[in-house]
Curated annotation (Swiss-Prot):
One of its GO terms (molecular function) is structural constituent of ribosome. Keywords: Ribonucleoprotein, Ribosomal protein. One of its GO terms (cellular component) is cytoplasm. InterPro entries: Ribosomal_bL33 (IPR001705), Ribosomal_bL33_sf (IPR038584), Ribosomal_zn-bd (IPR011332). The gene is rpmG. One of its GO terms (biological process) is translation. Belongs to the bacterial ribosomal protein bL33 family. This is Large ribosomal subunit protein bL33.
Length: 54
């Protein structure tokens, strides 16, 4: 099944630590995901780093 090879992660703002986005990616990736996304709390585009979703 393809769903077993994907995991859900959280993207959290690096400035205010607000958890804004959920993202699904493959389990075989060894690097931490880091994207520029819009943060509603900050009101601007900031870097969002990967964290674990419960």
């Amino acid at each position: 099944m393809a769903s077993k090879e994907r995991q859900t992660i959280l993207l959290a703002c690096t400035e205010c630590k607000n958890k804004n986005y959920y993202y699904a990616r493959g389990k075989k990736k060894e690097f931490k995901l880091e994207l520029n996304k819009f943060c509603k709390a900050c009101g601007k585009s900031t870097k969002h780093k990967e964290g674990k979703a419960n």
